[in-house]
From Swiss-Prot:
Compositional bias annotation for Polar residues: 41-53, 296-310
Organism (species): Arabidopsis thaliana (Mouse-ear cress)
Function comment: Together with RST1, acts as a cofactor of the cytoplasmic exosome and connects the cytosolic RNA exosome to the SKI complex. Acts as a post-transcriptional gene silencing (PTGS) suppressor. CER16/RIPR can, like RST1 suppress the production of small interfering RNAs (siRNAs) from the CER3 locus, which is involved in cuticule membrane and wax production, and in the typhine and sporopollenin biosynthesis of pollen.
S-S pairs: none
Subcellular localization: Cytoplasm, Cytosol; Endoplasmic reticulum
Gene: CER16
Cross-referenced PANTHER family: PHOSPHORELAY PROTEIN, PROTEIN ECERIFERUM 16
Subunit composition and interactions: Interacts with RST1.
Top-rank taxon, per record: Eukaryota
Disordered: region residues: 1-60, 296-315
GO CC annotation: cytosol; endoplasmic reticulum
Protein's name in the database: Protein ECERIFERUM 16
Phenotypic effect of disruption: Shrunken non viable seeds due to arrested embryo development when homozygous. Alteration in cuticular waxes. Decreased production wax with dramatically fewer alkanes.
């Protein structure tokens, strides 16, 4: 139903009710009075005419009552189904300003609530937990031992809030040094090389000895797979040490022989008659050289170094020592020596050349 038809039906309904109210009213019958008898007679003569007119023309408005009620019901149902715009348009600027004002008021209320809560928590936290934080861990130990701990509450102006989560880096570094390396890195000890593991364990043992001197020593913790690795590496180290000791002993023996030769030549220089003792010294020199060559050949047979570069270094050092020894021999002894000494020297030089 259109808005125009709805307006027409409302208008007809109002007119119908106004006419109906007028038609219902009955004409007033003039009262009987003694003062105007003439008017009473005139009215009595006119009243049957009016009653006839009313009876002759009955009202037919009752015929439209049902139709008007049906039209009103249909208009109400259609009006509830169809959304009729209240106005031609809305003021969007006004609506936006109202929404912004509401949002700002909500934000301010939330901020006020949060700030008050933050202030309350901060004050309570600083007063209750402040002394324990300043003690740097002592409060936690007191928790573990006894729950009844004393909190210092001072409301004076000299009260200062301790720094939240304040750390002493020096103390932390010292405590980390007391911990093993694999525990600091959260890895298995088998993954670390042995020297680093040993150094970390020695540091830990050195740091723990003064602090735990009054505690009995506990049994060492054996990690599976670690003992075999340590035993193998310790055996390798022992072998290296034995080889080095053998080489050092043999080198010391060679040096002792060379010292004897040098001492013999120095005694030859100090003697007043070198010509008389030349034959004796040459024979002693031959014997010393023979023993030296035998010892050197035996060391070469039993101890063959793994690297040829090490062998060359030892041989070059030995050759240099012998060259210095030969150069230090006196000139007076060399021409007076026997042919045997010259042959021995030639053989020795040829042997050095072959090396």
């Amino acid at each position: 139903m259109d808005s125009k038809s709805l307006a027409k039906s409302k208008r007809a309904h109002t007119l119908h009710h106004s006419k109906k109210s007028h038609s219902v009213h009955k004409p007033k019958v003039p009262g009987v009075s003694e003062k105007n008898p003439e008017k009473l007679q005139g009215n009595q003569t006119k009243s049957p005419v009016q009653s006839r007119r009313v009876s002759a023309l009955p009202s037919n408005w009752d015929r439209y009552d049902d139709e008007l009620d049906a039209a009103e019901d249909s208009s109400i149902s259609l009006h509830s189904d169809v959304i009729v715009p209240k106005s031609k348009g809305a003021d969007y600027l006004h609506l936006i300003s109202e929404a912004q004002a509401e949002s700002n008021s909500k934000i301010e209320n939330n901020l006020d609530c949060l700030s008050s809560l933050d202030d309350l928590l901060h004050d309570e936290f600083s007063r209750v937990v402040g002394s324990m934080i300043s003690a740097r861990g002592e409060g936690i130990l007191s928790w573990m031992e006894d729950d009844n701990f004393v909190v210092e509450e001072d409301g004076s102006g000299s009260y200062q809030e301790p720094g939240f989560l304040s750390l002493n880096l020096n103390v932390l570094a010292k405590t980390l040094e007391n911990v093993d390396l694999h525990e600091r890195l959260y890895i298995d000890p088998d993954l670390l090389p042995l020297p680093e593991l040993n150094t970390s364990q020695t540091k830990v043992s050195r740091n723990e000895e003064p602090s735990h001197s009054h505690i009995a020593q506990n049994d060492p913790i054996v990690v599976p797979g670690e003992s075999s690795v340590r035993e193998a590496e310790s055996l390798d180290q022992v072998k290296d040490i034995l080889i080095l000791t053998d080489e050092s002993e043999k080198s010391s023996a060679i040096e002792a022989d060379l010292d004897l030769l040098l001492n013999s030549f120095s005694e030859a220089h100090t003697q007043p008659n070198p010509v008389a003792s030349a034959s004796g010294k040459s024979s002693a020199f031959e014997t010393e050289l023979d023993s030296l060559l035998k010892s050197h050949s035996s060391t070469e047979q039993f101890n063959k170094p793994g690297n040829p570069s090490d062998q060359k270094i030892h041989m070059t050092g030995f050759n240099d020592v012998l060259d210095d020894l030969l150069e230090s021999t006196p000139v007076s002894i060399i021409p007076q020596s026997n042919q045997t000494s010259s042959k021995v020297l030639d053989d020795f030089d040829s042997w050095l050349d072959t090396i």
